[in-house]
Amino acid sequence: MLAVFLQGFALSAAMILPLGPQNVFVMNQGIRRQYHLMVASLCALSDIVLICGGIFGGSALLSRSPLLLALVTWGGVAFLLWYGWGAFRTAFSRQLALATAEELKQSRWRLVVTMLAVTWLNPHVYLDTFVVLGSLGGQLTPDVRSWFALGAVSASVVWFFALALLASWLAPWLKTQMAQRIINTLVGVVMWGIALQLAWQGASL
């Protein structure tokens, strides 16, 4: 059981650790200390749903529906281009100001919607959870499949909370205008790079 748990944990961690839309968003909110634990919780919860869905049968749905995959892919491209543009606009604005407490209060639901879009409109999430984890987990016998799923979701929960807390701890050094310009530029580059990669993949669907 422990070996299967560790296998799920290691495989999930290997797919979560690379810099992607989810990680960038959680890190950014941690630096701003702007509902970062809520964002980490929602990211982890979304991953739990996706991972369990993939391992316990959802991988077959995605493999049988090229249209669904295409819709998710192009929706993701559009969203990532929009999000990246916002990051570039912030990075190169003449006056870069941190949000006030009142602005943070008003933007909570916008953050929730953006986080859900970052997760659920990212085709890589479905490929990781449904195709990779789903295919491997589906090959296991029912008595150990749950341990594989538990290991996979544990990696997700640990990672997102660790990233949010670490970014929050480093916030005093990363909240300067220069650091924010650099971070937002990197966010824009990552988002547009992933969008172009997805567009290339979507053209071949």
UniProtKB/Swiss-Prot annotation:
Keyword presence, Cell membrane: yes
**A single GO CC term, please?**
plasma membrane
What catalytic reaction does the record list? L-arginine(in) = L-arginine(out)
Write down the membrane topology: Multi-pass membrane protein
Compartments, record wording: Cell inner membrane
Principal location class: membrane
Q: Report the InterPro entries cross-referenced here.
A: Arg_export_ArgO_enterobac, LeuE-type, Lys/arg_exporter
A Pfam family for this UniProt protein? LysE
According to the UniProt entry, its GO molecular function terms are: L-arginine transmembrane transporter activity
Give the family from UniProt: Belongs to the LysE/ArgO transporter (TC 2.A.75) family.
Q: What does this protein do?
A: Involved in the export of arginine. Important to control the intracellular level of arginine and the correct balance between arginine and lysine.
The protein here is known as Arginine exporter protein ArgO
Gene name of the encoded protein:
argO
